[in-house]
Amino acid sequence: MKNRLKLILLVGIATSFAPIAYSQTGSIEQRLQAMESQIAQLKAELAAEKAKGESDVIQLEQKIATPSAVTVSNQSSKSGFQVGDTTFKLGGFVDFDTHVSEFSDGGFAGGSVVRDFYIPGATPVGNGDNSTTTTDLTAESTRFSVTGSRNVGGKTATAYIETDFLLSGQGNERVSSSFAPRLRRAYIDYNGLRVGQEWSTFQNTSAIPESASFYTLGDGQVFVRQAQVRYTTGNFQFALENGNATITPAAGSGRIEADSNTVPDVVARYNYKGDFGNLSLAAIGRQLRFDTATTPSESDFGWGLSAAGRIGVGEGDLRFSLTGGEGLGRYIGLNSINAGAVNPLTGDVEAIPSYGGHVSLRYPLTEKSRFNIGVSALFADNPDFLPLTATENTQSVFAAYLFDIAPKVTVGFEGLLGERELENGTDGSLTRFTFSTKYGF
């Protein structure tokens, strides 16, 4: 309408000037030519205006279709969401557990981690007249993780952070149970290199049994997370990991967390995967150094080997590990055995030999339910100068039934029996029943 009005006005102006042109030229042909020229000019202007309008519409549509670099995509999918050129993924689960625990030789105060999951070396011994039963309800094993990845130099760089709420020094069960997050894993991956805090390269995490509780059969398993630098090439992995030896002092009891290493722990591992499952063979070398302000530094060499894996058995799988060496300490059995001990006669640090293993079977009963059963053990070859109150072995068995009541929602029931025995034959046991409800996301 606006363009038509413009045309009418221009034609009117041109017509009003026509008598003047006629008086000047007196020629009808000249007047017609002038009018035709004006009309042609108006058509050209209208065409230009139309083209410009279409161009503006196209640019506007493109601007709407293409978000800015800082716009967060609101399209949810399994591949995560994007912020700029970085893709983020959120993961984890909400876990509610009920534990009913009976300690044959004395219990633990509320808030102790021993009441949250099985720690083999902490089972009380030597007080058979003091059996204690406790019931605990907790959601502290709830877990949350964030993954961020982007293209850097034609390769994918990934950062990962994972937390839960176990072992929290904050909070209590009196009023609000305000447990603080703790760091589990935090690392960066790029071009075969992983740096940060991660599961030890000495450990095959696929061998961990499925359970209703946070962790089970800890006696003979390698179970360590720590800061490290790891390089993976093909089936081989090599790592330098944080070194920290636990030492039994000359007095013969207790534990010194020496943390006096001058070199990191060195780990090498070979992985093999196939249709059958996976197998791994790992070796570790470590320095057991003890140095204080009042004693000269002493050290010994620790080493270990570990074979572990997961193998398919029918519709289920068999998970296992076998580990042994000298000075393994905290790497096996959740540090039930120290890495070394100070000889009270010489003052030297001597590595303590230890060995253990576990095996568990996971077998599906239906599409939504499965049964797990397993056994684990750890043994120490303590030096003669250690007292007879030193831990000689720990053992445990468990069985668990898990059922998926809805997508990503699992309920589980578990029974566990754990025992610890000292060099003098004194022992104690833990019997625990666990009910859990878990929702993964």
Q: Which residues fall in each region the model found?
A:
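Gram-negative bacterial Sec-dependent N-terminal signal peptides
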Residues: K2-Y22
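N-terminal periplasmic/intermembrane-space "pro-region" immediately following the signal or transit peptide
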Residues: Y22-A109
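Outer membrane beta-barrel
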Residues: S76-D116, P120-I247, S260-K273, N278, ...
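Outer-membrane beta-barrel proteins
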Residues: G80, D129-T134, S176, L217-D219, ...
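Sequence/structural signature of outer-membrane beta-barrel proteins
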Residues: S101, N151, L166-G171, S200-N204, ...
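Membrane-spanning beta-strands of outer-membrane beta-barrel proteins
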Residues: A139, P181, V224, T262-D265, ...
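Detector for outer-membrane/organellar transmembrane beta-barrel domains
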Residues: G274-T391, Q395
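Outer-membrane beta-barrel "beta-signal"
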Residues: F403-I405, G428-F441
